[in-house]
Amino acid sequence: IRLIGNLVQLGNMFADLQGGLSTLAIRAPVLSVGDDGKYSTKLKLYAGTYLQYKYTIGDGFWNAEHAIDGSFQLREMIVPDKDTVVADSIHSWEASGAKPVHFSIDVPDTTPQNEHISLQLNPYGWMEPIPIWQTGTNHWEYTLYSPMNLVGEVAYRVCRNEQCDTAVDAAAIGENPVINTFTPSLIEQEIYISVNNWAFFQPSDEPTPVVTSAITKQKSGYVAGIELARFTHPSWYSTYTPAMKNIKNLSANLVVVTPTWSVTSNNPPVISQTPGVDLMQPDTIAMIQDARSEGLQVAVYPRLNFAVDVARWWAGGTRDQDWWQTWFDRYSTFILNQATIAQQSGASAFIIGGYDILPALPLGKLYDGSDSGVPLEAEMFWQTLISDIRSRFSGSIAWAVSYPYLFDRTPAFVEQVDWLYVLWNAPLAATADPNQAEMASEVLRLLNDDIKVMKTDLNKPGVLAVQFASANGAASNCISANDGCLQVNWDAVSSYTDPVSQVDLSEQVAMYNA
C-alpha cells in the first residue's frame, strides 16, 4: 500500500507525465505492516501545509481507495504544529461496475535480480508504469481492481524499472509489435503473460574482451570518473543508489552530475526549471549523497536544456542590450542556485562553461562564425559570476572547454578557476575505416599540439572528458547515414540515435583504447 498525495514526498512530481497525471507510484512512500496487521508510515511535513492524500495499491488513479458509494476517496487536512497520529480506514479498492483483472507474469531467467517489474496501461494513451508484486523467482503478479467503470478497452505491456520506452518486453516493440488488450467485464479475468526477451537487453555470462596496452598505475590525484547524462526522468530515482555502486565498481573516483534548467524561450530568453524534464533539487541532493556514500568525489556541472537546436536558438534571439541583460541575469540565477545545492550536498567541485554558452563569452561568436553581439561587459559578468560562486561554494571550480571549438581563444577570466574540464569533440581519424594505431597517433598529436599547450599556458590541471558513439564512422565524426554522414557534437547532446546509422561496438572500443 502506498500513500500518494499533493506533495513531492507523496509522489507528486508537479509535472505533465504520461497520461496527464502528475504522480508517480514509484516515488510514493510504501506503508509498513505491523504485527497487528495495520499499515503505517511516518512523514515529516511543514506545519500549516494543506495536505491532500489517498491510499493506493497503484498510482492513485489505478487501484486507488474508493468510498462506500464507489467514488474516489480523497482525504485532506492542515498539518498541525505538533506530532500527530492519523488513523484511517480503507473501505475498498474497487469501484462499482466491472470486476478485477489479475495478471500473472513470468519473466526471463536473465532478468537481473536487483530489478523490479512494472505494468504499463493504455486506456486512452500510455500512462506511467506501476510497480507490481513479486511472488516467486522470475514470477510477478498484479490485480487491477479499479477504476474499471471509467475505461473501455485497455492495452498493456510489461517492462523493467518503469522504463517502458526501452526496457520493455521485446514483443511489444519493433516493426510488428504485439499489442495485448483487455476489456473490463462483469466477470473476473485472469491474464497470463510470458516475457521471452527484453528489448535491447542481451546479457552474457562471457566477459567482453577489450584489447588494450598495459596501464601503468597513476600518481595520486589522478581522476577517473563518469559524467552522467543530463536528460532525466523522475522515475529514475530508484536507480541512483545501484548506479553509484556500479560506478564505484568500475574503479572510478569521480561522478559528474549534470542538473539542468530548461531554455523555453529566446525572445525574451527564459531559463527556468521544468518539473519532469529537469533534475529537481531533492533528486540532485539524493544523487550526490548516494555518490558520496560510495566514497566518490562529486562535481556538479549545470547545463542548459534547449527545446530546439542550440545554434538555432542563439541565432533566433534579438541579442540587443536588454536581451543580453536578461540572459545574464537568468543564467546567473541558475548557476548560483546550483552552486548553493552543491555546497549543501557536499560536492567537491563545480563546473561551468561548455559548448552551449559560447556566444555569451567575451568577443563571442555564433555557431556559424558570425559575431554574437555580446556586450563588452561580458568579461566582467563572468568574473563576477565566478566570484559569486566562490562566495557560496567552498570546493574547486573548473571551466569546461569545448575542444576543438574556439579552444585557442580562452577568456581572461579563466585565470580565476582552479582546473579545466576539456570536453573532447575532435575526430580521431580522417578516414572512414581507421585502425587503432592511427587513432592513437592522432590522439597523441592533438594532446601534444593543443591540449598540453593550453594547459601549460594557463598553468591549470585538467581532466579530459570523452564520449564516443557506438556507430560506424564515429572516429571521423562522420556517422554513416543514407545521405552521407551525420555529425554529432556530444557536448551539445547527451545521446543520439538514428535509424539509418550502423552500430559498431568495435570502433567504439578502439576509440576508447586509443
Labelled PLM ranges:
Residues 265-273, 318-322, 366-372, 433-439, ...:
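A solvent-exposed, charged loop/short amphipathic helix patch at secondary-structure junctions
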Residues 1-50, 56-79, 106-151, 161-183:
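Aromatic-rich carbohydrate-binding modules that target alpha-glucans
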Residues 203-247:
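Boundary/entry segment of secreted carbohydrate-active catalytic domains
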Residues 2, 224-228, 253-259, 299-302, ...:
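Structural recognition of the beta-strand scaffold that forms the well-ordered cores
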